[in-house]
Each structure stands twice: as C-alpha cells, then as structure tokens.
Amino acid sequence: MSKKTVKISIAGSAGRMGKMLVNVVDQHVECELVAATCHPSEEGVIGKDAGLISGINKNNIFISDNPKELLKGEVIIDFTTPESTVHNSNLAAENKIGLVIGTTGLSKEQENIIEKNSQLSPIIYSSNMSVGVNLLFSLIDKAVRSIDNNWDIEVLEMHHRHKVDAPSGTALSMGKVAAASREHQFEKIKKLSREGKVGQRSNEEIGFATLRGGSVVGDHTMILAHEDERIELTHKATNRKIYANGAVKAAIWCSNKQKGLFSMKQVLGL
C-alpha cells in the first residue's frame, strides 16, 4: 500500500526559509505543495510561480498574498513573523487543519494564543526544527541533571547579520531546558545581557551572549563551567535546509493528529 501524500501549504514562501521549504517539499515523496503565500508588501513575487521563485522547475503553484489560500492544505508550515503566525494559527484553528510553526520571537501573549488554538487543531511549535538541535536539547537535559549547582551555565549563540531577534529562540530554549532540569523558573534566573558593574553571578543564573555577523546560519553552545573543568555542548548549522527537512517531517507527523500542542521532541520520539 502506498503512503498517503500530505498536502502542504507554505506561508512566507518567498523568504529564505520559504524557498528552502518549497525545494524540500518538491523532492519529498510523502507530501506535495498545494499553496504558497507571501506578505502583501512583497509585490514583486505575488502571482509568480513558487517553484521558479525558489530556484527549481515551474510547479504551477502561484504565490498569493491571501492567507486563506493556505486552507488548501492539510498542514500549513509557517516561518514568517509573530503577527502573521498568530493570524495563521487562528485560521488553522477555525478550519481544524494542522500548523507547523518555525517562527521565533513570539511574545508570551502570542504563545498563549497559539496554545489556545491548539485545543481545536494540531500545532507543532518549536524554536528549532533541526534533528541535531533537538538532540542537543536532550543532551543538555541529561548533562544538567548530572551536575550540581556549583556548575555555572552560560549560553553563547551567533547568527547572520540579518537576524532580527536576540537571543535566538533556540538559545532561549536551551536555557529553558537547563532551568527545567534544575527545577528552576527560567524567567527568574535568565540573564540576557551584562553591562557595567553587575556584581558576582549567582549559582542559579543562566547567562546569554549574542553575536551577529556575516552569513552564519546558526551556532549554539551551552557552557557548563566548574572551578577546574568546563564542558561545552555545541551545535553548528551549515545549511538552513536542516530546518526545512525537520519542518516537513513535522508536517507529515502532524497530518495524523486531531488537535494538541506538540514539539519536535515528540515528532522525533526523544
């Protein structure tokens, strides 16, 4: 028996991640692209063939600025902006279709809307769709549970000069995993920046350092520092195709769910 072909809609199809997603879906045997949208301000791509815009052969899927076109799919993949993502999650919930969210920089209020909408439709929300990064999260959990509070935890991340949010969603997720492993409240112990005479760090504190420059796809390191030794857990992305591959894998998994809020950890069975 042949496998089901999942109908995929891509929001933000003219962006860097959107183009990569069009490429990955085109090559995948278990899904097909049925709709592609962009922001109304992207006038240069509206009505253009999504395949040609993405650097592949013509696929006869024409980019629209109407979000309702996304409803042609069984699952929407969304790497856009927080505002567009919330709108698309409302649309998915109203029509009970799946949604995979790779957008970062959502506020707590926006995340609450996503969570509420997951009561009506299946939503996969992850700060990073990469298999490797999600394995890193598992390694962080295991490592932090194995050490005591005398080890200091710091997170270092670097991305390309065009990234607009800082620290990255992945870096924050790393901190949240570590905090949960120590049974601490992340919001109370995070230190997103340091400047001037800030005093000695506390044992509970999780510090962040952010670098921006060049074309770096994404480097993330968690440093576990003790008096006499240091552990560094690192993931380096060299091609954003890893995020697209993960997102498509998540969309196929999502197509078999009725409702609920899930993460890549569940998709990958970690």
Describe these PLM feature segments.
Residues 3-8:
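Extreme N-terminal starter segment of soluble prokaryotic enzymes
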Residues 9-11, 16-67, 149-270:
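C-terminal substrate-binding/catalytic lobe of Rossmann-fold NAD(P)-dependent oxidoreductases
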Residues 39, 104-106, 128-129, 158-160:
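Short, ordered loop/turn segments at secondary-structure junctions
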Residues 69-71:
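A short, aliphatic-rich alpha-helical micro-motif
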Residues 76-77:
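N-terminal Rossmann-like NAD(P) cofactor-binding module of classical short-chain dehydrogenase/reductase
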Residues 86-94, 102-123, 134:
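Rossmann-fold NAD(P)-binding glycine/threonine-rich loop
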Residues 98, 113-130, 148-153:
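Rossmann-fold dehydrogenase core element
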Residues 134-150, 166:
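Rossmann-like NAD(P)H-binding beta-loop-alpha module
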